[in-house]
């Protein structure tokens, strides 16, 4: 913001613009609770009102693209909580709040409790699609758990009467609002399961505020729905109302009327389906009659006189007898030839000749083995003698035998040079046949 100067004053428009920007930057978003007053809604659809407490008030605006998400239009005197941006209406220089969301005061705690329970049950898997059961195509009886005096039960009965009046309905009357509602709904679900006379249950009520619908957000109600052996359709409030019961139920219907549509077959559709089945059955029966008539005519044409059938059978029997006799003779001849052939092969392969040949083979192998062993022994003896000669040639004993001696000092250390001895030193000389002890007289 530029510095204040009498030579460069702000215009009113510029001042309001600067103040608006400063407010919007300083207060990004605030939550404010107060009482509605001076509420108005012109044809534009925007809401204008004041929010006040016992000491102050502030002008507020909530544009149509935001207020369309508020469940019901507020009235003067209602306490609400706003999420808003702080701003300034430049045209009048009027400080105001631009509301982003609105809920009745006290609904914030309920909404937090709703989110906590929703997270808890979600982690337990109660919202999983895999645990939800299909509804029966043709229920024998529909159970309805709702208020007996509300609009919901009238809507449900009207739809069921229109779609399929033959389906009986069993009403479990319960309060749907207040502290008694939750336990009553739980007890009704338990009763329906205990009676076990309904194929599907509708649990619901008409629309209302979050507080009005709270019984359907209570944990015992959610767990009763999840534990029900009978499939449950939840129909709470309007389409925009989502409760914990909706998330746990096997099917969520946006309204009680829609729930009745979901659980009941369409009578007209079933009549049409039965008509189609009747036509198909009649056509199939006519087709079968024609086919069997043709088959009967064919069989009638093929049917012969019994005497002729007997003659043909007797002739066929004689023919079979001749063929059987001929085949028996052929089989005997074949078996006789096979027996002769086997006898000749047995004589040709006598075990006496085979044993004789085996003995000759063993004798030959034994002779070859003895010859090989003697040859190996001679070769190894010659090689050993040669190795002994080589070892004898390089042996120190052989060297001593040629007149050499190995001289060592008193400690047994070999003396290799005359520099390693001194005059008068005792030494030993090893010869080929013993040792002699000597004394060094001189070294040259």
Swiss-Prot record:
Keyword set includes Nuclease: yes
GO CC annotations, alphabetized: cytoplasm; exodeoxyribonuclease VII complex
Catalytic activity: Exonucleolytic cleavage in either 5'- to 3'- or 3'- to 5'-direction to yield nucleoside 5'-phosphates
Record InterPro entries: Exonuc_VII_L, Exonuc_VII_lsu_C, OB-fold_nuc-bd_dom
BP GO terms, sorted: DNA catabolic process
Subcellular location: Cytoplasm
Function comment: Bidirectionally degrades single-stranded DNA into large acid-insoluble oligonucleotides, which are then degraded further into small acid-soluble oligonucleotides.
Name the record gives this protein: Exodeoxyribonuclease 7 large subunit
Species per Swiss-Prot/TrEMBL record: Hahella chejuensis (strain KCTC 2396)
